[in-house]
Amino acid sequence: MTIKHITVQQAHQEQGTGAKYLDVRSIPEFEQGHPEGAYNVPLMHVDPETRQMRPNPEFLDVVRANFPTDAQLVIGCQMGGRSAKAAEILATAGYRDVANVLGGYGGAPQFGHVGWVQAGLPVAQTAADDRGYTALRGKAGDR
């Protein structure tokens, strides 16, 4: 399975044709702002004691509970690193139409990638009730 690597502009265009934007940043990052229409399933969580990032052991289960393997998914994070890892995990798990968003939400200027915000694309501060991690995780518990 080949993972596509796309710009934020391409990700926005793909959203317009039915792709789901999966934001794999932490819950606090997502709550500070995210691409409009995004779903939040963190690849990593902030450990409350150490303040360090640690893997989310439920990542794949939550994605599977909410998106079929034939879903068109564009995966974004802050700069593109976590989303590349998440895209790899999903492709290995059988997801067939996965794209990593280069530059993510905040941009990666050191690699020449503009972020969602810098590109002037639509941003939201709050998620629809069914797109935040708590709601998505709840669906995984129903399985």
Model regions and ranges:
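Short, surface-exposed ligand- or partner-binding patches at beta-edge/loop junctions that are enriched
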Residues: I75-G76
